[in-house]
Design a protein with these regions (language model features):
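Class I S-adenosyl-L-methionine-dependent methyltransferase module
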Residues: 122, 144-318
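N-terminal charged/capping segments associated with class I S-adenosyl-L-methionine
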Residues: 1-37, 42-144, 158-165, 173, ...
Length: 318
């Protein structure tokens, strides 16, 4: 068997099959379960097909992939929980790691100043109570590629955990080459589990910056504000935190002692897989494929193409 990279016109399906491959075209492909349909999962050979049958069987026969899918309260002929409870009920932790609306481009250069007019102008942006970085990133990449001005962005938030993750993401973008930084940022941002290689890259590449600051401010008052500017390749990130927040940031590069993958997933699923009536209401109008993908992400919390191997994602995201 030969390994190939998936691309346009290719099919890839591999849970934990180490050598599962994708082949262009359909004439040599084997379907997973004899279903001769366009969106069926395909394999390069019988060996891969057999090796992947056990995980595929559960997916293929999933109720979420059926056009006839109905919410649990319909199947069981009962009143859904959200109809019987209070109009507003708090649930889960009070952490808001992701925003609940799509990213916004605050500048929309083409619709306002215009690309030519802004090309040499300096831009200063404030994202107060920013939450995650989606609006920051959407706005920055909206600038023309040949933009030659200085762009200064100030980002703050009251939530220390959000600020810490934003700092890790920005330092990752600053330190690593784009093709290395992109997958690290993606999974640090959205995946509940990480490969050891990503954790190691963060610990080797970014954590020394934080340790250096912590060593220099060790004698400062706990609640004193301390700032450090990191400069690489003409870009810079200035991070201003309280001393205790710098110390806390350093701990976020390592998995908490004693927390293993099964326990981390159990804690996560106690939130993501409960309140089934609310979940059913959310996914009911989705297409079968999107519905199955949404449930898969709720169960495993790894942002990968549906069916891609999660084998290397064995470390809890700190």
């Amino acid at each position: 068997m030969h390994q190939m990279q998936a691309g346009p016109g290719m099919f890839l399906y591999a849970h934990d099959v180490p050598q599962a491959v994708a082949i262009r075209g359909k004439e040599r492909l084997l379907t997973a379960c004899g279903k001769n349909v366009t969106d069926s999962k395909h394999y390069c050979c019988k060996e891969c097909q057999i090796a992947d049958w056990k995980p595929h069987k559960g997916v293929c026969k999933s109720k979420y992939l059926k056009e006839s899918y109905a919410p649990g309260w319909v199947v069981e002929n009962r009143i859904p929980a959200f109809m019987a409870g209070p109009p507003l009920a708090m649930f889960g932790s009070l952490q808001y790691f992701w925003g609940n609306i799509p990213a916004l481009d605050l500048l929309k250069v083409k619709d306002n100043e215009g690309e030519e007019a802004i090309m040499q102008r300096d831009v200063a942006l404030l994202f107060a109570a920013s939450g995650d970085l989606r609006n920051v990133i959407k706005t920055i990449i909206g600038l023309p590629e040949s933009y030659a001005g200085n762009c200064t962005v100030v980002v703050n938030d009251l939530n220390t955990a959000i600020v810490a993750r934003n700092a890790m993401l920005l330092l990752t973008a600053l330190h690593f080459e784009p093709e290395v930084a992109a997958p690290i940022m993606l999974h640090l941002w959205y995946s509940a589990m990480l490969p050891q290689a990503i954790l190691q890259a963060l610990q080797d590449g970014i954590l020394p910056y934080i340790h250096d600051v912590c060593n220099k401010i060790k004698d400062k008052p706990t609640d004193s504000m301390q700032a450090k500017t990191f400069e690489i390749g003409g870009s810079s990130v200035r991070l201003m935190l309280k001393k205790r927040e710098w110390v806390g940031l350093a701990t976020m590069f390592k998995v908490p002692e004693g927390l293993r993958a099964p326990e981390a997933q159990s804690i996560r699923r106690s939130v993501t897989m409960t309140r089934v009536d609310h979940i059913d209401r959310h996914i009911y109008k989705m297409s079968p494929g999107r519905r199955a993908g949404a449930i898969d992400f709720r169960q495993h919390g790894v942002l990968l193409p549906f069916g891609a191997s999660r084998k290397d994602f064995a470390m809890p995201n700190p």
